[in-house]
A protein has these predicted regions:
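Nucleotide-activated donor-binding/catalytic signature segment of Leloir-type glycosyltransferases, i.e.
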Residues: 171-189
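Short hydrophobic beta-strand element within catalytic cores of glycosyltransferases
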Residues: 226-230
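A conserved mid-protein helix/loop that constitutes part of the nucleotide-sugar donor-binding site
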Residues: 125-154, 158, 165-172, 255
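Conserved acidic donor-binding segment of nucleotide-sugar-dependent glycosyltransferases
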Residues: 241-243, 247-254, 263-268
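Aromatic "clamp/platform" in nucleotide-sugar-dependent glycosyltransferases that forms part
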Residues: 209
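Short alpha-helical donor nucleotide-sugar binding micro-motif in glycosyltransferases
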Residues: 188-189, 196-201
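Carbohydrate-associated surface elements
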Residues: 86, 110
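A short, well-ordered alpha-helix in the C-terminal region of glycosyltransferases
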Residues: 256, 263, 270-284, 293-296
Length: 305
């Protein structure tokens, strides 16, 4: 056991040494880091003539370690790229007076619109949910909510795409709730199948307890699928325009969630109107739009170096 621990420490040290060497060897240009530990090294060892950009691809969730690092160990980072405006505002509050040189900017992930067919989508009475079957994703409460919905809407199906540690537990819950006929747990699916199922679905259901920037919601909107989601701390609110391309439900308000789902499931005309607004939102996050933000950031910043 001790030998394994020593071996792991050696590997980590060699990775650290290799990363430090790579960073110091770059005399000019741009370095973009996507992990906290790498961003710390970039701040410490990056050359003055190098544009140093850090990214955060998840919610910091107010963890003291992250906040301390942003304030004290990112001081030579030029730009910190965040996924949402809310994360940007929070981090700016954390670092003020401690890290005054680093600038925070918002650049979301982009969507490849070419993955989707150009034909008119033929929608089915299907609600879809996609993600890893992990406790934080809230699939347990999704099934309990669906159990109540399915009693009034037996003609609708819930399809869950994804695998993970809770798969067997959730399958057991489906049986306990007697919703086997209306729930299809499809397991892990390749991306082509995910897109195909999105194109057929009429609604997307998200019951996560925590999210960062749920990219799957952008994919849903490109497939003209309105979303109903709990308004957790960050994530869904950055994508969903309440009442326009979906609905945000106050977290834990399960009865309101059920009521909203039943309303939209019963009103096809409303869904059709929302579908067009979904596409408009998704197009704001297409590759060309997002890449232009990156190009602009890098080109304008290098002029100042």
């Amino acid at each position: 056991m001790m030998q394994e621990g020593i071996k792991a420490i050696k590997i980590l040290y060699l990775k650290y040494k290799s990363m430090r060497k790579a960073i110091t060897s770059i005399k000019e240009g741009v370095i973009i880091s996507t992990r906290n530990e790498h961003s710390i090294l970039l701040s410490k060892y990056g050359q003055d003539n190098v544009l140093k950009i850090a990214q955060l691809h998840h919610d910091h969730n107010f963890k003291k370690k992250y906040i301390k690092d942003f304030r004290e160990k990112y001081t030579k980072i030029d730009y910190f790229v965040l996924l949402t405006e809310q994360l940007k505002e929070e981090i700016e509050t954390f670092i003020k007076e401690k890290n005054t040189d680093m600038k925070c900017v918002v650049i979301p992930n982009f969507l490849d619109v070419n993955e989707f067919s150009e034909k008119n989508f033929e929608k089915e009475k299907t609600v879809i949910a996609i993600g890893r079957l992990h406790p934080v994703k809230g699939f347990d409460r999704m099934l309990r909510i669906w159990e109540k919905i399915s009693k009034k809407h037996p003609e609708w199906q819930l399809k869950i795409l994804g695998g993970g540690e809770e798969e067997e537990k959730l399958k057991m819950l489906v049986k306990e709730l007697h919703i086997e006929k209306s729930v299809n747990m499809m397991g892990m699916c390749n991306h082509d199948i995910v897109i195909e199922e999105l194109e057929k679905a009429s609604l997307y259901m998200m019951t996560s307890y925590s999210e960062a920037f749920p990219f799957v919601l952008i994919e849903a909107m490109m497939a003209e699928v309105p979303v109903v989601a709990f308004d957790v701390r960050v994530g869904p609110k950055a994508i969903i325009q309440d009442g326009e391309n979906g609905y945000l439900i106050e977290d834990k308000e399960e009865e309101k969630f059920i009521e909203t789902m039943e309303y939209i499931m019963s009103h096809e005309k409303e869904r059709v109107i929302m579908r067009k607004k979904c596409v408009k939102k998704a197009e704001e996050l297409c590759e060309d739009v997002v890449m232009e933000k990156w190009v602009s950031l890098i080109e304008n910043s290098r002029k100042m170096k």
